[in-house]
Amino acid sequence: MLRGQQGLHSVDPGGIEVLSTDLAGFRAVLTLENRTLKRALTDPRLVSGIGNAYSDEILHAAQLSPVTFTQKLKPEEWDRLFAATRSTLTAWMDRLRLEAIASFPENVTAFRPEFAVHGRYNLPCPRCGEKVQRIRYADNETNYCARCQTRGKVLADRSLSRLLGSDWPRTLDELEALKHR
């Protein structure tokens, strides 16, 4: 059994601590491989401490699509992503720290009513009022606002898009028209 730093190192996947790095370091790590933003942010070998819930919130705050590839981001998008990552993590760490001081949490959940998009499928986006969309895959889902993050494009959900085939709605307008058929 290893103790101290050696013990921690054996289970640490090695991702950077966003609050302890600068924009250049953040960008360098996330562009090592050309991945989608969602996948890059949730890979603990790249970034430490960002899971499914916080990645949804970060991408919404940055107004970036979860399926944009890291090597396609423009400088101003990197600025927004880095700022949103730091501010989202800081805000939630502060909030959770205060909650823990008040009382020990009775249940731990990734779905919080204060979230903007995560776990809020079909509820209104707090920024624009459009319904939050989702992409389901395996045991996870990605939540996003099509208006704020994808310029109105509805991203394909593997299970539903296979079922609907060519009838899959590509935009918010097409989705609304489909609902009124």
Report each predicted region and the residues it spans:
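Short functional micro-motifs and their immediate structural scaffolds
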Residues: 132-133, 153
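Short cysteine-rich clusters marking metal-coordination/redox-active sites
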Residues: 125-128, 145-148
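Short metal-binding segments enriched for Cys and/or His
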Residues: 151-166
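Gly/Gly-Pro- and Ser/Thr-rich, intrinsically disordered tail segments characteristic of DNA damage-repair
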Residues: 1-2, 20, 162-166, 171-181
